[in-house]
Structures are given as structure tokens and as C-alpha cells.
Amino acid sequence: MIKFSRRRLAKLANAQIDDRIDYKNVDLLRQFLTEEGKILPRRVTGLTAKQQRGMTRAIKQARIMALLEFIHR
């Protein structure tokens, strides 16, 4: 028997998405990283595909700008 998971609402659905997802907003970006520093997948975060792409870009930019670490030890 196949079990279907219930659709989740995006965590950032009610907020202004474009304003909040930014490489300078380090506190928000850290919520979407594991303890090892890996980016959490969409099925865990509950973001839409567009939001996840923006989040990934922002995290990668923050890493390049040295606002986030590449590896957490």
C-alpha cells in the first residue's frame, strides 16, 4: 500500500520571500543548514522549488563572502 505524504506549507509562505532570502541574512540561512553545514533538501525544509533555488544561491554566496563556513566542525 502506498502512503502519500500530506502537502506542507512553505515556511516562508507568509513573509516577503524576495526580501528575506538574501546572502546577508545569515540567521535565516543557518536555519536551512545541517550541523555539518550541508544545505537541507526541499522535502525537509518545506520550501517551494523557487524558494529553494533562491535559498541555495544565497547560502552559496554567503559562503563565498565568508559569512558562512563551508564546513562546520
Swiss-Prot record:
Primary location: plastid
Subcellular localization: Plastid, Chloroplast
A molecular function (GO) term: small ribosomal subunit rRNA binding
Any one GO CC term of the record: chloroplast
UniProt-listed Pfam families: Ribosomal_S18
Transmembrane stretches, start-end: none
Top-rank lineage group of the source organism: Eukaryota
UniProt xrefs under InterPro entries: Ribosomal_bS18, Ribosomal_bS18_CS, Ribosomal_bS18_sf
Keyword Ribonucleoprotein recorded: yes
Keyword terms, alphabetized: Chloroplast, Plastid, Ribonucleoprotein, Ribosomal protein, RNA-binding, rRNA-binding
One GO term of the biological process aspect: translation
Subunit details: Part of the 30S ribosomal subunit.
Matching HAMAP family: Ribosomal_bS18
Family statement: Belongs to the bacterial ribosomal protein bS18 family.
Name of the protein: Small ribosomal subunit protein bS18c
Protein source organism: Nephroselmis olivacea
Organism placement in taxonomy: Eukaryota, Viridiplantae, Chlorophyta, Nephroselmidophyceae, Nephroselmidales
